[in-house]
Each structure stands twice: as structure tokens, then as C-alpha cells.
Amino acid sequence: MKKTLSVILSLILIFSVVNLGGITAFAENETITDGDYSYRLLDDGTYELLSYDGADTDLIIPSEFRGLPVTVLGVYSCGLCDNLTNVVIPDTITSIGSQCFKKNPSLETVTIPQSVKEIGEGAFSECPSLKRINIENLAVWCEINFGDQESNPFCFASEFYLNGKPLKDVEIPSSVKKISNYAFYSAPIETLKIPLGVTEIGIGAFVGCKNLTSISLPSSIKSIDRAAFMECTALTEVTIPKGVEIIDEFAFYKCSGLKKVTVPSSVTSVTISSFNSCTSLEELVVLSEANLEFGDLGSTALTIYAKSGTPTESYAKANNIPFTSLLIGDTDGDGSVGISDLTLVSIYLSGKGELTSAQAACADINEDSTVDAFDMFYIDKAIYA
């Protein structure tokens, strides 16, 4: 009798396990609702948040469901939440879907963890009240795959915080090799220092950074991509380092406060829109002898400085722009390299005088964007050669 009962119980258990397995398999492809949240089990054994239908003002998105991590915020999953003002995203999330937070009219603050690797198109579109963005890791932020400009919350936000501290002066970490497209789109930063090792500034990386007054670029950069610094209206001076080869279209478009630009000898490509509508430009120093297309720069107070006989001289004359010939080492512009040039550099290095952009370009013999004792040595050598 006991043996028969044991067999029956075993059969019941087997059928129960088979039945439960069927339910689990079915659930993997279905929406699971738990209170205000709906989820979907992904192939990798983690969950995607499909929707949030609550009315909270402060939302801390769950980091797990049924003991498994939530790694994806789905398309439009947290949109149309009229009351939502503050969102904290957990450090399990790696992907924020397209239009995830779209049309949240009251949203003011978002905290984004360093686990996030991609943010889809329009993730923060139509969030007009967005004010403050908190991030944890600047290097990771630089490398996030942003779908477009409105996937970056800086499209609307006016305050940038790194680990709870306001960030206005940005120094890119040395581990970064490329600054992603739209990484700092419209960010409220004031100064920018990019270290040696970064090779590319992505499309629209710093578009509309209207408070940005100073940028320091390394010689490791090969390309300044399309619209990288477009509409950075507070920039007044840019020295592009030797090593840059391509300045893509709209790179400095509508930088209306820009007065001085130095283009190094390494540059082989400039488009007609790269510096278009830089209406305050006064000094354009071109050390490159390549055939560069400057287009309509939009300034009436401009003087171009370049070597005689170059395509840049032809461009200046064809467009009735005042032109001054450059001779490397000829800091005082008298047409020869002599003691007076050495004296001028010495006065500058002692802190008792200044150099114009053109003078600095002539004095910076090795084109390292710095006039220093090495340049004095080269000038001295040229004088007594």
C-alpha cells in the first residue's frame, strides 16, 4: 500500500514540475504586472521594465524583480507621468530605451548610474522642467552611446553634478579615447580640458555649451567631428593642436563670440561650414598649406594670417579679406628672423608682455600650442645658422 502511494505521489510531483516549467516558459514572452510596474523577462535572465503607471513625484526605479536584476528601461516605459519630478535609476540598468522619459512635464532631477551604456533616441524629449543631472563616473559618461541630442538630458538641464558636487570645470579622464556623439550636448560647463590620449571628439559632443569659455585640446586628436563645438557662443579663442587632420562640417559653426583661431600645419581638411557664421572672428591664423575650404566666415573685422603662396592666401584675396604673410620665427612681423624676435619672446616669457595669435603662431616653432624656452632655442638657432 505504501509502495503504491509513493508511486502516485511521485507521478503527481513529476506532472507538477512539468506544468510549472510550462508556465515559466510562457511567462518569458509575456508582460508581467506587479503593482504600478510591468516587466518582461529577457533572454539573458534579467528583466526589462516595460512601463510604470504610478503617480509618484519621486521615483526610485526597482533594481530587481522576482530576485533577478532589472537591466533595461523599455521604450516609453516612464513617459507621460505628469506628477514625476525626481527619478533615481538603479545601478543594474545598462540601457535606457528610446523616449523612455518623454513628455514628463514636471521632471526636474535625474540620477544616472555608471552602469548605463546606452540611451536611446529622444529618451528625455519634451521634459521642459528638467533642471539637474547627477552622474557617478565622468569617464563612463563620455563613452555612453547616445541615440541623438534628446537622448542626453543636458538638452534641457541647467545643472550638472558629479557624485553630488556641481561640475562646471570639466577635465576628461585620461582613460577616455573617444568622446561620444552628443556626450555633453548643451551641458552647463564653463571650461574643458581634454587630455593626451583622446583621439576623437564625436558628432555634436559639445553643441550649445553656451557657458563654455575655454577649451584645451591635446595633440592626440585626429578629428573634430561634425558640429562638435557648434553654437558655443562664449568661446573667444581656439588653438587647434598640431595632430588634428580633419575639422568637419559645422565644427565651430555659429560660435559668435570666437575672435581668434589657429589652424595647425597638420590640418588637411576644413569644410565651408566648419567656421561659418563666426561673426566676431578677428584673427584666423593658418599654418596649414593644404587647400582648405573656409566658406563664408561671416566676420567683417577679420584678418587672415598664413604663409605666402598658399591656397589660404588665394582664399583671402578672392574674398577681399585682409591678409598678412607669416614667416615662422618672425615674431615681430618684420619679414625676417632676428634678435628682435628673440627679444619679443623673452619679454613674453618673463610675463612682461603679450603675443597676438599670429605672433604666438610664429614663435611656436614646434607647434605644441605653447611658446616656451624650446621655441627660443629654435629661434636663436635660426638666427645664427
Could you describe each region identified by the protein language model?
Residues 145-150, 296, 311-320:
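Short, aromatic/basic amphipathic alpha-helical patches
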Residues 75-77, 97-100, 120-123, 148, ...:
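Consensus positions within tandem repeat domains that build extended binding/scaffold surfaces
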Residues 19-25, 326-385:
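Cellulosome-associated attachment modules in secreted, modular CAZymes
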Residues 4-23:
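Sec-dependent N-terminal signal peptides of Gram-positive bacterial secreted proteins and lipoproteins
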Residues 36, 42-45, 54-71, 81-95, ...:
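Structural signature of tandem-repeat unit edges
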Residues 22-38, 55:
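Low-complexity, acidic Ser/Thr/Pro-rich repeat tracts that form intrinsically disordered stalk/linker regions
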Residues 150-156:
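Short mixed-charge
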